[in-house]
């Protein structure tokens, strides 16, 4: 209600992880660039990464790297949306908000790119 034009897409990161769920909500000719360094450390995920031999794509598909939901928002409204969500989640243990990437233009179908 507060940001009617600023939230462009939302994706619940379930089975299929980043590579299947994010492209479903993106327009053609866009790419979701995920900055791995901005994904918060998670002890359970760290344990899985160290315990199992998996490719990066398998980790992001199977374990979602601890990310459960993604919002794609207008870059000019990002800061105020971020603060609003932080305020809404302040009493929710274990739930937090992070900026982990951005959308860019590219040729072809929607993609997810890890950097």
Each language-model region and where it sits:
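Glycine-/charge-enriched secondary-structure boundary and capping motifs
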Residues: 1-115
């Amino acid at each position: 209600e507060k940001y009617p034009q600023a939230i462009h897409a939302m994706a619940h990161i379930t089975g299929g992880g980043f590579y299947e769920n994010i492209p479903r909500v993106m327009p053609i000719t866009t790419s979701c660039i995920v900055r791995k360094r901005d994904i918060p450390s998670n002890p359970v995920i760290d344990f899985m990464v160290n315990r199992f031999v998996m490719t990066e794509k398998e980790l992001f598909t199977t374990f979602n790297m601890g990310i459960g939901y993604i919002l794609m928002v207008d870059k000019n409204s990002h800061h105020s949306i971020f603060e609003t969500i932080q305020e809404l989640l302040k009493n929710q243990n274990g739930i937090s908000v992070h900026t982990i990437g951005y959308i860019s233009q590219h040729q072809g179908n929607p993609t997810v790119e890890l950097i």
